[in-house]
Design a protein with these regions (language model features):
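Short, well-ordered turn and helix-capping elements at secondary-structure junctions
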Residues: 44, 68-72, 168
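A recurrent flexible, glycine/aromatic-enriched loop bordering the glycosyltransferase active site
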Residues: 49, 72-85
């Protein structure tokens, strides 16, 4: 899906997997990215069982040295996982193959081997909301942590349910 944005994205940008609910503040990830350079900086989270996720090896300079998507128990070398939130350079589009591909399986391992990925661990909460049960857990976390607020919907082409909320400071114009 990210490759479909190559015509409208330029420079440094943030990318977030749509099924993640977390307490991540992106500024420290961006700061590390600016400091270390490279093509990408990934937010990282520590888990007990990393076999459902992409795992990373991280050196003392916050460079990702290895990346393995959904390892078997025998392949696990770390409990730090890719938390589905990235700061990337538009150079990423130059190395993405056209058509269907997986950034986690086909792009990140090579970038890690080339020293082009950084990692920033965060604390708070992280929920992979890809199942109905975990989606409900994510909604509850947002309510508990007061992550909902209201912004503004302007113009005539957007449909907004009266129960929908737009975050403070955001404007939807269309």
């Amino acid at each position: 899906a990210l490759a479909n944005c190559s015509d409208v994205v330029s420079g440094t940008f943030a990318c977030f997997n749509g099924d993640i609910v977390s307490s991540l503040e992106i500024t420290p990830v961006l700061d590390l990215h600016k400091k270390n350079g490279g093509i990408g900086t990934l937010a990282l989270w520590e888990v007990e069982d990393p076999t459902r996720f992409g795992i990373v090896g991280l050196d003392d300079n916050s460079r990702i040295t290895q990346f393995k998507e959904k390892p078997t128990k025998e392949e696990v070398f770390s409990n730090l996982i890719n938390a589905g939130s990235y700061v990337l350079e538009d150079d990423i589009f130059d190395i993405m193959p056209r058509g269907k591909h997986s950034i986690e399986r086909e792009i990140f391992p090579g970038l890690a081997a080339d020293g082009q990925l950084n990692g920033k661990q965060f604390s708070g909460y992280f929920i992979d909301a890809g199942t109905p049960e975990s989606w409900s857990e994510g909604v509850q976390a947002c309510i508990r942590n007061k992550r909902f607020s209201s912004g503004e919907v302007c113009g005539g082409s957007w449909f907004s349910n009266p129960m929908a909320k737009v975050i403070d400071g955001a404007r939807i114009v269309g």
